[in-house]
A protein has these predicted regions:
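Sequence-specific dsDNA recognition surfaces
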Residues: 1-5, 11-44, 66-67
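Enrichment for repetitive, rod-forming helical segments
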Residues: 8-11, 23-25, 50, 117-118, ...
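Short conserved micro-motifs at the rims of enzyme active sites and ligand-binding pockets
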Residues: 26-27, 61, 131
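Basic side chains
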Residues: 2-4, 16-18, 73, 110-111, ...
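Amphipathic alpha-helical coiled-coil/heptad-repeat segments
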Residues: 79, 86, 90-94, 100-103, ...
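Short, contiguous acidic/charged loop-to-helix segments that flank catalytic cores in large enzymes
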Residues: 32-35, 74, 138-142
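A short beta-sheet element
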Residues: 16-17, 35-93, 99-104, 110-111
Length: 174
């Protein structure tokens, strides 16, 4: 890890392909300094594209973390996250095929291949109409994933305490 936490700093977990696949950072995740550039800090709802090894794209909802060099944070100043997430996901099979054709040991996609990807931009009127349908669903996916992460953490804290008898639930009516 290039940007390790300095003495006294509470490190940020590093988002690598393993964490992207499992949807969370865990105790085995490497740590980086929280003083890294803001563009390398990942937040819930960010779109992450893995370009090396395992090519995949996902909506990160695993909490704040630092970005590994084998991942891109996909952003746009002009379009909503749902738009560029869906287009990246649409292109993924082509990216995987290109990477497989060029793989010597580990497949990866080069920036020039990403730049060749074609995207159909709807008219402003159509974009707004599509946005009213898709954005609420996209926001709900993010919200549900975050809630799922929080509920999983709560379960992982409470279940051992209930199983050991530290917390008594025998009087709870269900």
């Amino acid at each position: 890890q290039k940007y390790r936490p300095k003495d006294g700093e509470t490190g940020l977990p590093v988002l690598k392909i393993k964490e992207l696949r499992q949807g969370i950072c865990d105790a085995s995740s490497e740590l980086c300094s929280p003083s890294i550039k803001s563009e390398y800090i990942i937040h819930d709802g960010d779109i992450i594209f893995s370009w090396s090894g395992s090519l995949l794209v996902d909506i990160w909802c695993g909490g704040t973390c630092g970005l590994n060099q084998h991942l891109f944070k996909v952003t746009s100043n002009n379009y909503d996250k749902w738009f560029y997430y869906l287009w990246t996901a649409h292109q993924l099979d082509r990216f995987i095929a290109v990477a497989a054709d060029k793989a010597t040991t580990m497949g990866h996609i080069k920036r020039e291949e990403l730049e060749k990807a074609e995207v159909i931009i709807p008219s402003k009127c159509d974009y707004k109409r599509i946005r009213t349908l898709i954005k609420p669903l996209f926001d709900l996916i993010i919200s549900n994933r975050i809630e799922n992460r929080k509920l999983t953490a709560l379960r992982n804290i409470l279940l051992p305490k209930i199983m050991s008898g530290e917390i008594d639930v025998s009087d709870i009516d269900l």
